Swiss-Prot record:
Its EC number is 2.5.1.55. Belongs to the KdsA family. One of its GO terms (biological process) is keto-3-deoxy-D-manno-octulosonic acid biosynthetic process. It comes from Pseudomonas fluorescens (strain Pf0-1). Keywords: Cytoplasm, Lipopolysaccharide biosynthesis, Transferase. One of its GO terms (molecular function) is 3-deoxy-8-phosphooctulonate synthase activity. This is 2-dehydro-3-deoxyphosphooctonate aldolase.
Length: 281
């Protein structure tokens, strides 16, 4: 099965290429913290030889509470992203929530992300596709892996085949998510790169009444399980002080654990991709 290669600058993204990291923080809390987080990611990924794209959100539009922190907003967010690109020379990925944001974000960011909750919103999908930017499509918690084909088709029909799929867990009763490991293989059959968002797969949606809970202690176990499926890359959020993060702290890796965490996953990725394919169909 031929695997499609997506190129972002000098980075090649494909299921049979070395793992790529989409990593950063959940939401832009401040310019200084974004710089601190990106600097650590750049240092670690350069040391380990992992291709890297910085991730953060300028707006968290689906918070559980109307009083929860959402981010600096579109204009300030784009200024911070431009500062990060200038300082570190890394590509940027961020999410888009409304059709009229797509073109503005695509002017600054190298990859634009379709949020899981919004992945069936045709107007948003088409607006994002028409930017011709690379799109990271999050699989909704309520969709089966095979249903991602419909979202891919919407993008292609709008003229964009620069697409990535991303698993982020499936609803498992109330306030819980589970990752179906068989789903990775189903999505890989579409031949587009598949990523694993381990951070949000650890969520317990609404688990703290007015915000999501999480299972940070299990991040290494779940990341290893996902990356054993020979994927294009990992989606990860880290924070210098997760217990005081403004969003999704219970799911975030401690920033000072980034190097040992990624070292294990890189070794696993190399091992898995060294194996010959065994046809069992």
């Amino acid at each position: 099965m031929a695997q499609k290669i997506i190129r972002v600058g000098d980075i090649e993204i494909a299921n049979d290429k070395p793992m790529v990291l989409f990593g950063g923080m959940n939401v832009l809390e401040s310019r200084d913290m974004a710089m601190q987080v990106c600097e650590e990611y750049v240092k670690v990924t350069e040391k380990l030889g992992i291709p890297y794209v910085f991730k953060a959100s300028f707006d968290k539009a689906n918070r559980s509470s109307v009083t929860s922190y959402r981010g600096p907003g579109l204009e300030e967010g784009m200024r911070i992203f431009q500062d990060i690109k200038q300082a570190f020379g890394v590509p940027i990925i961020t999410d888009v929530h409304e059709p009229d944001q797509a073109a503005v974000v695509a002017e600054v960011c190298d990859i634009i992300q379709l949020p899981a909750f919004l992945s069936r919103q045709t107007d948003l999908v088409v607006a994002m596709a028409k930017t011709n930017a690379v799109i990271n499509i999050k699989k909704a918690q309520f969709l089966a892996p095979q249903e991602m084909k419909h979202i891919l088709n919407k993008c292609v029909e709008a003229g964009n085949d620069q697409l990535i799929l991303c698993e982020r867990g499936s609803s498992f009763g109330y306030n819980n998510l589970v990752v179906d490991m068989l789903g990775f293989g189903i999505m890989k059959q579409f031949e587009y790169p598949v990523f694993f968002d381990v951070t949000h797969s650890l969520q317990m949606p609404g688990g703290r009444s007015d915000s999501a809970g999480g299972r940070r202690a299990q991040v290494t176990d779940l990341a290893k399980a996902g990356m054993s499926q020979s994927l294009a890359g990992l989606f990860l959020e880290a924070h210098p002080d997760p217990d005081n993060a403004k969003c999704d702290g219970p799911c975030a890796l401690r920033l000072d654990k980034l190097e040992p965490f990624l070292a294990q996953l890189k070794a696993l990725d190399e091992l898995v991709k060294s194996f010959p394919t065994v046809e069992t169909a």
